[in-house]
């Protein structure tokens, strides 16, 4: 979920922190990409409704491959435009997120029931919509994605915890230019630059500058974290009756959630005295202090400890994996890699050989140095028959 309605709030209250840019603007830049978020998007984008069934891209064993198609094409798109992607995967979710994960699991189960009902009724568009809501990423899918990206020569990082937090750390350390994710909580983790909107080829990309945002909001970082918690985040329930606009007004007046809670208590007491319903409802378990701590001191590997290096694609093993094991069309792999190799270098370094060094490093969450604190439908790259009907 990220931060509820934060994008719209910032458009209204801090419009000057936004820029809309086309992809080629980022030529020569290194960008940290939220791999888990991208995989969800690609899996959904490669699903379609048949006459009586939902169709998905799969390998010969029925394993979903839409995420691989998307990651392959997106990586080629980046490289072809002179962008150096660093793919960052989620590690173990924080305990505070367990409630949100349980909520999502329940919603997926409900969506599965609705999918089956819609299929029985022949409502294929509704069936597709509900099926998309059941999308999950298995450990095997994650391992396949990491294997493919390594073979393509890209740096891959497995974060100790949240991918957005690790990207923000890399960005603050100067290792990458920006964090690319749809999750707005990358700003809560203090990424200096956030990029959103890579899902379409023709539409511009939103660039959000953290310092410009804070200058317009005229609040401290700690107050911004409290604002995000009040808007609604993944780590705790929110106070009912307080939306982004009200949260901002209250933060400006009372400075912190503690001050706001005192205000809420007074307002509700006054309304109770007048035999009125409470204006605000504070959840029984309002874990704002723990949430605040998680945002301010997340579990990440220090940026200065991470060395980002690129390698030339291992074409032989990449084709063996994608063509023989995952059912991709060999011609698609060849044509994609040729596009990059032939890219003109005028104005920016975009040839494959200018990008890739000697090694690609994988940073694991159990590393002893890890310390706490598309778009149009993706072009089908698989052979005919690589689809799964539901």
UniProtKB/Swiss-Prot annotation:
It holds the Pfam family XPG_I. One of its GO terms (molecular function) is DNA binding. Residues 359-390 are annotated as: Disordered. Gene3D superfamilies: 5' to 3' exonuclease, C-terminal subdomain, 5'-nuclease. Mg(2+) 1 binds at residues 34, 90, 162, 164. It is found in: Nucleus, Nucleolus; Nucleus, Nucleoplasm; Mitochondrion. Its EC number is 3.1.-.-. DNA binds at residues 74, 162, 232, 234. Keywords: DNA damage, DNA repair, DNA replication, Endonuclease, Exonuclease, Hydrolase, Magnesium, Metal-binding, Mitochondrion, Nuclease, Nucleus, Phosphoprotein. CDD domains: H3TH_FEN1-Euk, PIN_FEN1. GO terms for cellular component: mitochondrion; nucleolus; nucleoplasm. Its main location: nucleus. Belongs to the XPG/RAD2 endonuclease family. FEN1 subfamily. HAMAP family: Fen. PANTHER family: FLAP ENDONUCLEASE 1, FLAP ENDONUCLEASE FAMILY MEMBER. Structure-specific nuclease with 5'-flap endonuclease and 5'-3' exonuclease activities involved in DNA replication and repair. During DNA replication, cleaves the 5'-overhanging flap structure that is generated by displacement synthesis when DNA polymerase encounters the 5'-end of a downstream Okazaki fragment. It enters the flap from the 5'-end and then tracks to cleave the flap base, leaving a nick for ligation. Also involved in the long patch base excision repair (LP-BER) pathway, by cleaving within the apurinic/apyrimidinic (AP) site-terminated flap. This is Flap endonuclease 1-1.
